[in-house]
């Protein structure tokens, strides 16, 4: 048996020999991640369903990495990554938190812990934009849950590791959860799970119960157990008995899976290992797992119990061993597909073959009460230096950078440079009003003021494709308590939507009402709390309401403005479905609206105006957003899925100094085009939700009657709940895969056995059905109580946004009457 302390694996090198282990201290608590070579950097996101243990796992990672001196606890509200007051009081993650920390002395992990609640989907979307890979955390009791399915789809192209958490809980099943993983994500694909470690249960001397106490390391053939009295101690044992048998079978299954895709491993297995599974080296297995994980052919699976400090260090090892570095990940998506991109092993992503071209994406803005506005950025190419002159290719503005920081959740570490692959923070007065979420920043890697050295047409016009913002589905009216509070309310709202672009503001010109729109009830509840308690807005709120939209079903007239001093603009509005599919389009906020700019004669020539094209473009975009927010003729709801087309004959005076006049001209043209459109050319749209219901079979009839009748639902499918037996080992076979994957059986305790027997006896009368449907959001805002009544409290459901659909004539008047 070997026993050692692992309190500071990040600042220590652990050497294992046959008879001894030595720990060599190597340094500082904040080992700078800026010093790590690109090949040793990992940009990861932690994603999962709410309450699967994302933040708990992250806190253990920070403890074992040496970042924190004690283990943060969600329940007591002292976590590092959940540092907002609302997060600590509610015990949930509300916004994504970024933190950088070292591991194993040489690796740097940039981690983003994301929310699990569906209302904060945008936080996951923008995190996925800048990470290279994911750790998916699954609840061993609940299996694959609804939000896990959603984030898995959203992160489809990202390499992943799965960590099955809460293995210490009553009802936990490694077997069921792995099978659930296969059935929901891998059936019909070529992707397979590879069990890197499996649970180890120890039988209690005073009962027949088994307690989860560690993991069996399948790659190295060892048993790891954690001392419950000392979170810093891991005990390593040789395998015997059932543990050895399970490990051998898992190792054989692992090698069979890997050799299906990896010819190098096939050759090693046949020649060097002589066809003996036990002789395949751990080094070769790790290399094969890494190679195939990065190709999305396999998903390594590990397990543990983060709250009990079990399995976290092996998970950290898997992150650095199997997930890609920035020079092995996907290349960024640029607006100009003709610009060459490749990875250089020394400098990372190389754009336009220019080592001095630095490109970064601003993916998040926060307001710190002390430091002011801070912008999270991901460096994709080149080097960003403090004090550099930066060009915002999204807005056309130039400015000088202030301080650079590396984020540590609620704190940060000052640095002088940020290199390709890093996630960092920008602060200072110069960035406050010059950067928003989704902006692309460009600078020279080695010159403080080297923008003139970059190609004006090919490099300074580059943009990383914008972050998708889903449309809001709920709204709440907001007004100042007194007229003197109006300005502070507007400033607070502006701060709020700058930090969270999935919130939006709409105004009714007729009533003067201001509406704050968001992704769900909890989303708006948090926003209201922030407005009042953090931003000190003295306001009153109305009732929660569904966010309806309007759209047009035909093109407007072309409206033209021409002046003697050189301004000329012609534009029209049309439904998105009528827009040309390959035209150059710019997104307009959160409502699926677009600006189409046709090329004019000056487009490809030397730019002759004093203001940049980006400044002109952003003024037009701002006027378009205002014009579309004014709403349609049915009920003044904001317009949705519309394109504004600016004809190619547009021009501005050569001596134009500011784009303010352009904003006014285009806004008035939009108003005129919409005013001239007949009322019957407008349609009312409502949010439609995907509804997943799990109910007893005996209640299917009454629930279906309620859905199709009172709730106007469209039933998509009715299926038996997917269930997998937990008694005994199993093999699962994806329909596209020929080899079978061994999954060890779960240890059975006395309580489990009694529960299983009871469930078996009740099966005939308690079969669960899953109903999938589409239903208008308006009809299920109070569905929780209704379903509880219909199913005697045994039903549960999840909803997520599907799309906006035209309101049918038979429901239109009812909706308008209730407004």
UniProtKB/Swiss-Prot annotation:
GO terms for cellular component: mitochondrion. Keywords: GTP-binding, Mitochondrion, Nucleotide-binding, Protein biosynthesis, Transit peptide. PROSITE patterns: G_TR_1, G_TR_2. Belongs to the TRAFAC class translation factor GTPase superfamily. Classic translation factor GTPase family. EF-G/EF-2 subfamily. It holds the Pfam family GTP_EFTU. The keyword Transit peptide applies. This is Ribosome-releasing factor 2, mitochondrial. One of its GO terms (molecular function) is GTP binding. Residues 1-30 form a transit peptide. The gene is MEF2. One of its GO terms (biological process) is mitochondrial translation. SMART domains: EFG_C.
């Amino acid at each position: 048996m070997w026993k050692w302390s692992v309190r500071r694996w990040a600042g220590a090198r652990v050497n294992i020999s046959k008879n001894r282990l030595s720990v060599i201290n190597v340094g500082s608590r904040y080992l700078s991640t800026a010093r790590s070579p690109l090949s040793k950097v990992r940009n990861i996101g932690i994603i999962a369903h709410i309450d699967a243990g994302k933040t708990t796992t992250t806190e253990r990672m920070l403890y074992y990495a040496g970042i924190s001196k004690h283990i943060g606890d969600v329940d007591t509200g002292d976590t590092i990554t959940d540092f907002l007051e609302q997060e600590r009081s509610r015990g949930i993650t509300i916004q994504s938190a970024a933190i950088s920390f070292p591991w194993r002395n040489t690796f740097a992990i940039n981690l983003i812990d994301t929310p699990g609640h569906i209302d904060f989907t945008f936080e996951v979307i923008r995190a996925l934009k800048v990470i290279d890979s994911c750790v998916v955390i699954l609840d061993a009791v609940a299996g694959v849950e609804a939000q896990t399915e959603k984030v898995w789809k959203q992160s489809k192209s990202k390499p992943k590791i799965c960590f099955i958490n809460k293995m210490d809980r009553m009802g936990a099943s490694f077997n069921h959860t792995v099978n659930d993983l296969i059935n929901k994500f891998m059936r019909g694909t070529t992707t397979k799970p590879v069990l890197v470690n499996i649970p180890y249960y120890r039988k209690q001397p005073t009962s027949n119960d088994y307690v989860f106490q560690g993991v069996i390391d399948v790659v190295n053939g060892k048993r790891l157990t954690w001392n419950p009295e000392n979170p810093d101690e891991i005990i390593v044992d040789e395998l015997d008995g059932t543990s050895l048998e399970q490990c051998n079978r898992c190792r054989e299954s692992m090698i069979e899976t890997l050799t299906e895709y990896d010819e190098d491993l096939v050759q090693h297995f046949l020649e060097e290992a002589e066809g003996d599974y036990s002789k395949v080296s751990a080094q070769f297995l790790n290399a094969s797992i890494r190679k195939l994980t990065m190709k999305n052919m396999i998903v390594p699976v590990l397990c543990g119990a983060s709250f009990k400090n079990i399995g976290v260090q092996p998970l950290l090892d898997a992150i650095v061993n199997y997930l890609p570095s920035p020079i092995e990940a996907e290349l960024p998506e640029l607006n100009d597909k003709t610009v060459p991109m490749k990875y250089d092993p020394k400098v990372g992503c190389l754009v336009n073959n220019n080592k001095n071209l630095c490109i970064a994406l601003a993916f998040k803005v926060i307001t710190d009460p002390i430091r002011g506005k801070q912008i999270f950025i991901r460096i994709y190419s080149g080097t960003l230096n403090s004090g550099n002159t930066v060009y915002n290719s999204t807005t056309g503005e130039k400015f000088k950078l202030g301080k650079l920081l590396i984020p540590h959740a609620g704190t940060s570490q000052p640095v002088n440079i940020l290199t390709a692959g890093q996630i960092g923070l920008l602060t200072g007065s110069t960035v406050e009003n010059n950067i928003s979420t989704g902006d692309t920043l460009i600078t020279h890697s080695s010159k403080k003021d080297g923008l003139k050295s970059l190609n004006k047409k090919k490099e300074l016009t580059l943009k990383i494709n914008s972050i998708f913002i889903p449309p809001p589905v709920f709204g709440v009216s907001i007004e100042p308590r007194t007229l003197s509070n109006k300005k502070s309310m507007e400033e607070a709202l502006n701060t709020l939507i700058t930090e969270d672009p999935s919130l939006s503001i709409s105004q009714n010109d007729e009533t003067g009402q201001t509406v704050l729109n968001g992704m769900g009830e909890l989303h708006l509840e948090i926003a209201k709390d922030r407005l009042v308690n953090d931003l000190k807005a003295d306001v009153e709120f109305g009732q929660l309401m569904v966010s309806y939209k309007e759209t047009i079903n035909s093109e407007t007239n072309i409206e033209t403005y021409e002046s003697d001093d050189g301004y000329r603009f012609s534009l029209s509005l049309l439904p998105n479905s009528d827009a040309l599919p390959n035209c150059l389009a710019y997104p307009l906020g959160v409502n699926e609206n677009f600006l189409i700019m046709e090329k004019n004669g000056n487009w490809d020539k030397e730019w002759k105006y004093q203001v940049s094209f980006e400044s002109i473009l952003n003024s037009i975009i701002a006027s378009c957003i205002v014009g579309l927010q004014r709403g349609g003729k049915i009920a003044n709801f904001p317009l949705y899925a519309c394109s504004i087309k600016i004809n190619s004959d547009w021009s501005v005076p050569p001596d134009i100094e500011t784009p303010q006049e352009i904003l006014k001209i285009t806004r008035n043209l939009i108003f005129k085009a919409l005013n001239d459109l007949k009322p019957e050319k407008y349609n009312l749209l409502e949010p439609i939700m995907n509804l997943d219901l799990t109910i007893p079979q005996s209640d299917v009839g009454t629930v279906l009657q309620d859905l199709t009748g009172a709730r106007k639902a469209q039933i998509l499918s009715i299926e038996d709940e997917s269930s997998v037996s937990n008694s005994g080992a199993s093999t699962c076979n994806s329909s596209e895969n020929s080899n079978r994957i061994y999954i060890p059986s779960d240890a059975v305790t006395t309580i489990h056995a009694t529960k299983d027997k009871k469930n078996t006896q009740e099966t005939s009368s308690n079969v669960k059905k899953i109903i999938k449907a589409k239903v208008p959001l308006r009809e299920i805002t109070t569905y929780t109580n209704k379903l509880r009544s219909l199913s005697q409290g045994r039903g549960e459901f999840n909803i997520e946004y599907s799309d906006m659909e035209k309101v049918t004539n038979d429901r239109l008047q009812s909706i308008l009457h209730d407004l």
